[in-house]
């Protein structure tokens, strides 16, 4: 019996006839989906958790202390203990690794840690550290207790990563001088510093690098009530009149992600200013987000397209990732890292050994109803 991987195949496990039979088990209730994004607009950009090029978050919106940091309660407790212990011993923090979907605040919490420790904060990204010279430039200028933050740390070049091993473990920088038989290694002592890494793909990190972090912590999606607090805080800092119901409407469509919540808030603010009196109520927020094609569950047209294609062309699945990408025209990595995490989180999609499967909850949300029993979930 052949097992078809959800990643390794671009073809669905079932033939056209079987797919047609399964698709006939479904009919759409009442309405058709309109993929407005295919007509030129791209409202889906609002819901992408990655920071947009040129998108700058006002520094005033960033929390500066753990007390100001909303959400991630368990993580904050762990970090507060680590900070208190390090302060008592008058030592730098152990190295930390944060992982989780984009937009959850990994960079922000790293900056908060540096501020809590009274340390200088240096920030870079792994793709910017192309050669050993790049990382060495940071390491040699770090003072005791300084924090070096590397985003997308899973993308470090191997030669750069290997240079970090002795730096993290023994606080020394090994430099090779010369070439061939005349080459020799010189070690330079480094000040005790704290390295904080952030990644959306912890499985892509090598074991030697991952094992050198004293703390490995996951950031989870935010609860709606936490996002309401974040939206109200943003409204207060930006001096925008917002009632709790309006904040709740924005929060529940924000895919559990603070970055998206703040982005949606700014678009609703624009709408309220132009179409209303500037006040954000529940009605104003709902009207604005409907205009931007963000539905009450936080799905955009691409989310609905992915789910609808699975239902109407493949009877709900299972479907391999490469097949989904080919049919929808989306990049496989984009589907896996941008769209799938939230669909999995809210229970609209399942991963199985044979591929992706749409759940009954997603079918109800999209307005489908079953005409016959489904073998694919049995």
Swiss-Prot record:
A GO BP entry: DNA repair
Region (Large ATPase domain (RuvB-L)): 13-222
Biased composition (Polar residues): 1-12
Molecular-function annotations in GO: ATP binding; ATP hydrolysis activity; four-way junction DNA binding; four-way junction helicase activity
Superkingdom of origin organism: Bacteria
UniProt: ATP binding residues: 61-62, 103, 106-108, 169-171, 212, 222, 259
Chain positions covered by the region annotation Small ATPAse domain (RuvB-S): 223-293
Binding site for DNA: 351, 356
Region described as Disordered: 1-62
Catalytic activity: ATP + H2O = ADP + phosphate + H(+)
Metal-binding among keywords: no
Region of interest (Head domain (RuvB-H)), ranges: 296-378
Keywords, comma-separated and alphabetical: ATP-binding, Cytoplasm, DNA damage, DNA recombination, DNA repair, DNA-binding, Hydrolase, Nucleotide-binding
Top EC category: hydrolase
Primary location class: cytoplasm
Intracellular or extracellular location(s): Cytoplasm
Binding site for Mg(2+): 107
Matches recorded under InterPro entries: AAA+_ATPase, AAA_lid_4, DNA_helicase_Holl-junc_RuvB, P-loop_NTPase, RuvB-like_N, RuvB_C, WH-like_DNA-bd_sf, WH_DNA-bd_sf
Domain notes: Has 3 domains, the large (RuvB-L) and small ATPase (RuvB-S) domains and the C-terminal head (RuvB-H) domain. The head domain binds DNA, while the ATPase domains jointly bind ATP, ADP or are empty depending on the state of the subunit in the translocation cycle. During a single DNA translocation step the structure of each domain remains the same, but their relative positions change.
Entry function: The RuvA-RuvB-RuvC complex processes Holliday junction (HJ) DNA during genetic recombination and DNA repair, while the RuvA-RuvB complex plays an important role in the rescue of blocked DNA replication forks via replication fork reversal (RFR). RuvA specifically binds to HJ cruciform DNA, conferring on it an open structure. The RuvB hexamer acts as an ATP-dependent pump, pulling dsDNA into and through the RuvAB complex. RuvB forms 2 homohexamers on either side of HJ DNA bound by 1 or 2 RuvA tetramers; 4 subunits per hexamer contact DNA at a time.
PANTHER family, per the entry: HOLLIDAY JUNCTION BRANCH MIGRATION COMPLEX SUBUNIT RUVB, PTHR42848
Subunit structure, as described in the record: Homohexamer. Forms an RuvA(8)-RuvB(12)-Holliday junction (HJ) complex. HJ DNA is sandwiched between 2 RuvA tetramers; dsDNA enters through RuvA and exits via RuvB. An RuvB hexamer assembles on each DNA strand where it exits the tetramer. Each RuvB hexamer is contacted by two RuvA subunits (via domain III) on 2 adjacent RuvB subunits; this complex drives branch migration. In the full resolvosome a probable DNA-RuvA(4)-RuvB(12)-RuvC(2) complex forms which resolves the HJ.
Homology family: Belongs to the RuvB family.
Protein name as catalogued: Holliday junction branch migration complex subunit RuvB 1
Organism: Synechococcus sp. (strain JA-3-3Ab)
The gene coding this protein: ruvB1
